[in-house]
Amino acid sequence: MAAAKLEDADALIDSVETFIFDCDGVIWKGDKLIDDGVPETLDLLRSKGKRLVFLTNNSTRSRKQYGSKFRTLGLTVDEEEIFSSSFAAAAYLQSIHFPKDKKVYVIGEEGIINELELAGFQCLGGPSDADKKIELTPGFYMEHDKDVGAVVVGFDRYFNYYKVQYGTLCIRENPGCLFIATSRDTVFQLNGVQEWAGGGSMVGAILGSTKQEPVVVGKPSTFMMDYIAKKFGITTSQICMVGDMLDTDILFGQNGGCKTLLVLSGVTSHEMLQSHNNSIHPDLYTNQISDLLAVKAATV
C-alpha cells in the first residue's frame, strides 16, 4: 500500500498525544538544523499540549551531551525527553538485572561509557582502546577479562582489530556473555555532507567472528518503545513516530503499533519510498517536519 502525502496536519496532530522524533535527518544534519522552521514546529506542538520525545540510534553521545547539542542549536529540550541508543544499552542491562559485579566491554564511543557508568555498571574498552594494536607474532596470546559479562557494540569512529578480537574473546570464552548492539544502522549522517558507514558495520564484524546474533536495543527493536510507553504511561496507538529512515524509524513505529510519518529531509528520497523494491510504507510522508506548521492556517 503506497504512503499518502501529508495534507491535513491538523488531523494528524489531533489524532495523537505524543510525537517521537528521530534526530539525524529530521531535526538536524551534522551540526545544523534541517530548516529554520524546526523550533517553531516544536513550539507549536508543545502549545497544543503534545508530549515530545527525541529518539536517536546514534550512541556516540549520552543524554546529557545530546541536551547540550539541542541547546547549542537553539532548541529547548529537557534531558528526560531524550532517548539515545547509548541510554538504551544501559536501560536494557538494568531491565535484565545485569549483575553489578560483572563488567561491560564497550566497542563504541564515550556516550555508551557515560550512560553505563551513570547506571552503575563497570566498563572497559571504548575510547581508551582507540589506539591499541595487536602484533600477530608467533605464539602471541591475547588476554581478556574473564569478568566481562556483556559486550556492547555501537558506532565507533576508532574501530580497530584489537577491539574486534577483545570483544570476540569475551563473547566466545566467557560463559553467558551477552552481545548487545545499540543499532544495526547501515548508514550514519556524521557531518551532513555525505552518508557514512553506520554502526551496523561494527556490529557485523563481531557477528561475523562470533556467529552470534546480538540483542538490538535501538530502532527498529521495540525495546525503547516499550520503555518510553511505560515511563510516560502512553498507549502506543496515541504515538506518532517521525523519522527519515524506513528500515529503522518507520519499522520501529510499525513494530510498536504507532502512527508513522516519514520525512524526506534525511536518508530516504521520494524515489526510494515509491520504489517497487521498498516493502516498508509509512502512514504518511512529507518533506520536513516544519510542514506540520500548516496547521497554523487552520487555527488563525
Predicted regions and their residues:
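Conserved glycine-rich Rossmann-like NAD(P)H-binding loop of the short-chain dehydrogenase/reductase
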Residues: 53
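Asp-based, Mg2+/Mn2+-dependent phosphohydrolase catalytic module
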Residues: 1-23, 28-50, 59-80, 90-300
